[in-house]
């Protein structure tokens, strides 16, 4: 999955599965669909964030709408025109039916934002 980050308050193009690019003047969005997930299982997917700016960017932290979903962010800065892998993990314990969560990634460039949308269908 490739995610591109941008630097502004404007939304980028429609979110695409596992892809995003950081560029000046937009919010990079990515959509992660886990599909059917067995109840009480943890599942993981990865996506790539590409730095389309002219300065290195560090992915500092993230916020999530649910403690059942978390990210593993790279520790090193992403150089211009380079990319880094981010891992998203979803724990289906305590969830059922259709699940959707939103995560936002804070970067070292305050005008560069990444929005991650996650969905899953919990089956028993």
Predicted region positions:
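Short, solvent-exposed loop/turn segments enriched in Ser/Thr/Gly
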Residues: 39-46, 93-102
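Terminal connector regions
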Residues: 96-124
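Short, acidic/polar linear motifs in exposed loop/turn regions
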Residues: 52-55, 94, 109
């Amino acid at each position: 999955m490739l995610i591109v980050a941008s630097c502004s308050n404007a939304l980028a193009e429609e979110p695409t599965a596992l892809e995003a690019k950081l560029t000046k003047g937009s919010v990079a969005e990515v959509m992660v669909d886990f599909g059917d997930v067995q109840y009480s299982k943890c599942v993981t997917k990865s996506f790539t964030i590409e730095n389309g700016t002219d300065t290195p960017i560090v992915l500092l932290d993230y916020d999530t709408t649910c403690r059942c979903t978390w990210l593993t962010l790279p520790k090193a800065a992403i150089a211009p025109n380079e990319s880094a892998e981010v891992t998203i993990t979803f724990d289906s314990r305590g969830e059922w039916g259709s699940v959707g969560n939103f995560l936002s990634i804070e970067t070292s460039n305050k005008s560069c934002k990444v929005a991650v949308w996650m969905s899953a269908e919990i089956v028993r």
